[in-house]
């Protein structure tokens, strides 16, 4: 459409091709006719400096995990959640338009004092990323032995409630299919205490 665009971030993941995303400090000077699309999620100093940039501001709100989920497991998680919620409230007077990924998130913004127009736009999933051939070694190890395999993918964290998945699997294995396996595929980096609690729960249920 002829618009000049760029993607800038505070932290850039290693999986992205070089040059696609640039560091926020390299953002050029903006003008009042520019538009900033700001992805609001966790606590960051950018929440308190966004107002200093010229141009209209569109905020995409992609949920902030309530800090109470991390109580007893991660002090960092608690502080990040609290700071994120404070930043979300601080930005309420600096948004010209908002997109929330769910009705729940829209209500969160309204409760935090946002008075601009807020629409809901669910997360668009690039299904092409999942069009991959399965790993042969894993398939040969777990396929064809008569077991039902149940897979959950996602970060191991209290807000994901993996204990509920384990509880569900326990009932499934006990009542319906003894020859079954549960895979929880995800990193527990920073959530080691929660991971240990899950291990204890598995032992308590005598699951293997």
Feature-to-residue mapping (PLM):
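A short, basic/aromatic alpha-helical/loop segment that forms part
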Residues: 157-162, 173, 189-192
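Short N-terminal targeting/anchoring amphipathic segment
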Residues: 26-60
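Nucleotide-activated donor-binding/catalytic signature segment of Leloir-type glycosyltransferases, i.e.
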Residues: 186, 195-208
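N-terminal subdomain of nucleotide-sugar transferases
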Residues: 1-11, 33, 89
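Membrane-proximal helix-turn-helix segments that form the acceptor-binding/catalytic region
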Residues: 65, 77-97
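Nucleotide-sugar donor-binding and catalytic loop/hinge architecture
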Residues: 133-149, 173-177
């Amino acid at each position: 459409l002829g618009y000049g665009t760029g993607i800038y971030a505070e932290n850039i993941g290693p999986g992205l091709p070089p040059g696609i995303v640039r560091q926020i400090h390299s953002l050029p000077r903006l003008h009042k006719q520019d538009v900033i699309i700001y992805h609001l999620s966790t606590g960051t100093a950018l929440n308190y400096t966004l107002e200093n940039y010229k141009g209209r501001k569109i905020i995409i709100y992609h949920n902030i995990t309530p800090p109470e989920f991390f109580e007893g497991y991660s002090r960092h998680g608690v502080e990040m959640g609290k700071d994120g919620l404070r930043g979300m409230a601080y930005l309420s007077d600096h948004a010209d338009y908002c997109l929330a990924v769910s009705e729940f998130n829209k209500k969160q913004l309204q409760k935090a004092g946002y008075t601009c127009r807020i629409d809901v736009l669910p997360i668009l999933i690039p299904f092409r990323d999942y069009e991959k051939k399965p790993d042969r070694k894993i398939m040969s190890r777990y396929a064809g032995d008569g077991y039902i395999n149940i897979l959950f993918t996602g970060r191991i964290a209290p807000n994901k409630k993996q204990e509920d998945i384990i509880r569900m699997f326990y009932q499934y294995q006990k009542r319906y299919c003894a020859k079954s396996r549960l895979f929880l595929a995800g990193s527990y980096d920073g959530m080691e205490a929660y991971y240990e609690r899950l291990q204890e729960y598995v032992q308590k249920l005598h699951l293997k």
